[in-house]
Amino acid sequence: MHTQVLFEHPLNEKMRTWLRIEFLIQQLSINLPIADHAGALHFFRNISDLLDVFERGEVRTELLKELERQQRKLQAWVEVPGVDQDRIEALRQQLKSAGSVLISAPRIGQQLREDRLIALVRQRLSIPGGCCSFDLPTLHIWLHLQQAQRDAQIETWLASLNPLTQALTLVLDLIRNSAPFRKQTSLNGFYQDNGDDADLLRLMLTLDSQLYPQISGHKSRFAIRFMPLDSENGLVPERLDFELACC
């Protein structure tokens, strides 16, 4: 059983978008293979949410900029004594490769947008109970196909996201590992500090405290208020130790 809980909070809009995309892509694989109506609705709802996120911003452009920025950061480490040069070069090649694949890929989510079944289900998701068999006979018969046939179609859908997934995973991994966790202490449930142009806050709390953070701020400055899960009887200690990484 976990004894600590990790919380992550974005400090700018691009990071907020990336974390949402990462979350939705992870959700797509949780209930695979799809064998029933509940699993299908979970899958298609996450597909629909993902397409909505894609339509709100320049996801590809921002990721390509970040891939280039990370390459420049790695270049600055090349001449530092004691640095693993082979590791640096391997990461640079991964970033370069991910950028090449992403820039040459079709519009992100285009294959999913143009799929007839996905489009039909998306139209009904906002209607309470709108995905019944009489509303969506197409989905109904799809769920009665051979499992292998459904699996193959889902694999094709997910494969269309691979250029995005590869680049996003690489970028987020580098950002998350760009700063170590350090012990901090809040006073009367409150903590604030400078962001130092960070993109992401990562905060570790012990589970037995049953507290959660409410975080506000941006890349220059942020504030954390610790709240009890039990809003009526829970207590926040005068001094609370936690671990924080500004990435």
From Swiss-Prot:
UniProt xrefs under PANTHER family: CELL DIVISION PROTEIN ZAPD
Annotated family: Belongs to the ZapD family.
Any single Gene Ontology cellular-component annotation: cytoplasm
Keyword DNA-binding found: no
Organism from which the protein derives: Salmonella newport (strain SL254)
Keywords carried by this UniProt record: Cell cycle, Cell division, Cytoplasm, Septation
Task of the protein: Cell division factor that enhances FtsZ-ring assembly. Directly interacts with FtsZ and promotes bundling of FtsZ protofilaments, with a reduction in FtsZ GTPase activity.
Biological process per Gene Ontology, one example term: FtsZ-dependent cytokinesis
TM region(s), chain numbering: none
Cellular compartments annotated: Cytoplasm
HAMAP family: ZapD (MF_01092)
Listed SUPFAM superfamilies: YacF-like (SSF160950)
Subunit organization: Interacts with FtsZ.
Protein name per the record: Cell division protein ZapD
